[in-house]
Amino acid sequence: MKLILMTPPSYFVEEDKIITALFEEGLDILHLRKPNTAPMYAERLLTLIPEQYHKRIVVHGHFYLKDEFKLKGIHLSERNPDIPENYKGHISRSCHTLEELKANKKGHDYLLFNPVFNDISKSSYLENYSSEEIRKAHKAGIIDKKVIALGRIDENNIKQVKNY
């Protein structure tokens, strides 16, 4: 199982130190998600994170940062849905329905499926599918190792997610 973390949408004091500590403790991938912020703040944060961890960071927006900082890749979403022209590299995408998962399986390294449980960071994101529907999607091959669950996953329900 990979440990993937999504940053909060706003910057905060000493965020670079916390991110570095998380990488030191085994964080596999960090999704740098800072919607509605100027790129210079992302640039500043990235300069404060040791270069050895850059190859484990995926950016949501400001895609030029991928090459400038030698990052792992880019993440596509409703806000930034299109792959940049001539882009080569890691691509992940947010999906909110089983239909979106089916449509985007090819051409992506993995898909983030949200919300599996009610999402605390986005109060309007309520779980869309029952456990039974998710199990059926898994049996049908819609949900596989390329699909990563998001949405209030914690120590109390992670085993349930793993069993899907």
What residue spans do the PLM features occupy?
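Non-cysteine beta-strand/loop elements that form the S-adenosyl-L-methionine
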Residues: 109-117
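Conserved N-terminal beta1-alpha1 strand-loop-helix module at the mouth
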Residues: 1-110, 139, 143-147, 153-164
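A short acidic, helix-capping loop that chelates divalent metal ions and anchors anionic groups
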Residues: 117-123
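Charged helix-capping and loop-helix junction motifs
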Residues: 44-46, 125-135
